[in-house]
Amino acid sequence: MEELAVEVRGSNGAFYKAFMKDVHEDSITVTFENNWQQERQIPFHDVRFPPPSGYNKDINERDEVEVYSRANEKEPCCWWLAKVRMIKGEFYVIEYAACDATYNEIVTIERLRSVNPNKPATKSSFHKVKLDVPEDLRQMCAKDSAHKDFKKAVGAFSVSYDSENYQLVILSVNEVSIKRASMLSDMHFRSLRTKLSLMLRNEEASKQLESSRQLASRFHEQFIVREDLMGLAIGTHGANIQQARKVPGVTAIDLDEDTCTFHIYGEDQEAVKKARTYLEFAENVIQVPRNLVGKVIGKNGKLIQEIVDKSGVVRVRIEAENDKNISQEEGIVPFVFVGTKDSITNATVLLDYHLNYLKEVDQLRLERLQIDEQLRHIGASSRPPPNRPDKEKGYLSEDCSGTVRGSRPYSNRGRSRRGTGYASGTNSEASNASETESDHRDELSDWSLAPAEDDRDNYHRRGDGRRRGGTRGQGMRGRGGFKGNDDQPRPDNRQRNSRETKARTSDGSLQIRLDCNNERSVHTKTLQNASVDGSRLRTGKDRVQKKEKTDGVDGPQVVVNGVP
């Protein structure tokens, strides 16, 4: 309640500032500023209103003025009547009129004012009206805020409720205010009744809301986020908090920025925990062996990027060796994952699985290397002879184990009698100690791909035993060779591919001749399957018998593989 300011004259003649509280028949009740005196009643003739705002006159010498000063230290300042004796610049020499003895003081213009033009108050200076308050509005009228609009409309300086008499007291300095109060009283009480009804409803609704909120907020989650991760937890423009509030069942989310603490309230525990997953950001360190760092990162960071994408972490950081924030062990590189609790858990599962896989693969490779090393040691100490099929054995069969009449064993033959272009039909390992198994295979394949006798006779020979185009040479012929006249014309019946056509005799023998240094050889190999017309190749035993028969015939001596 606003109070009307007045000036009250004391026993010393000075006027003190006070506030009017009530009006009586011949006095008013006032309270003093700063309560330096108790509340008491003052007669009308000792009360006056302050001068109007802006009232000020020029002060000259010998003018009566009022000085704002105090009589002693216990009393507040008040306005004393005085007279100006002298003016020196901004300073005024004044003489107090209320004192018996002459008392002068030098003051500044701020402590001076012209004499108050208001006269002492009378009974008609104040107006008071009382309005009976209905019983249902008594509680409502006890609130000063309920009469704010009514006070302004009436023009009164005070509207208060008397709880003892159940009346509404209206004080004013204008008689018009009393008339307006009587005119607006019914309307004011009616509006108060409507306001009271609405206020009661609002209070009831507020109570229900509070009870519902307390019931709905039975489940509460509280957690702290690191200060450097608060930006991630809040999100861009509070996106994460808004997303957490949209979770069904969440009633409120509060954030204490000073302590970085989140408070989540909800109707059930699941809703509160789900909202927490959106806001609880943390940092986790996973130790990775140094030898597996490259395989964990992958080419161009493909593998580590896949882990980040699938887990949902915000970022991953690989700490440097000289980073002192995280303790590092020898041979270990820390991988720091930043994100929500769930995303960090997912990243940990993915990375652990990949690390276990890499360790198992390295273990399998190590075992393979150990096995290979053992095999190399065993092979170096005792290497078994290579197993070769029968068709690669050639002349090492049991039928050829003996020596042909007039010839030497193949195992004892040297290479000194042969030219550089000589091709031997033997596949004996003892023929040349430096030959390898692959050399023998090539040699056998050469025998199988050698041209037939008829094919060979079509090529002309040179006198030194080498072939040349044009005419045939005069070298010796082996069995099954062409014995006709050299000058007799011969039809060219050989096929273009000499490898596909082999010359055979009537008994099924395969005629092959290799000439080098005027030497000839005859070799026969038994076919695996008989031909359609029943012809077959001779075995090694038949070949030996045939050679012996040839040696017994009178005529030129036959040279077999360079041996007479």
From Swiss-Prot:
It comes from Xenopus laevis. Keywords: Cell membrane, Cell projection, Centromere, Chromosome, Cytoplasm, Membrane, mRNA processing, mRNA splicing, mRNA transport, Neurogenesis, Nucleus, Postsynaptic cell membrane, Repeat, Repressor, Ribonucleoprotein, RNA-binding, Synapse, Synaptosome, Translation regulation, Transport. One of its GO terms (biological process) is regulation of filopodium assembly. During early to late tailbud stage, expression intensifies in the craniofacial region with prominent staining in the endodermal, mesodermal and mesenchymal regions of the pharyngeal arches. By early tadpole stage (stage 35), expressed in the forebrain, midbrain, hindbrain and notochord in addition to craniofacial regions including the ear vesicles and eye. In the central nervous system (CNS) of late tadpoles (stage 45), expressed in the olfactory bulbs and the cerebellum. In adults, expressed predominantly in the brain. Gene3D superfamilies: 2.30.30.140, K Homology domain, type 1 (3.30.1370.10). Belongs to the FMR1 family. Coiled coil: none annotated. This is Fragile X messenger ribonucleoprotein 1 homolog A.
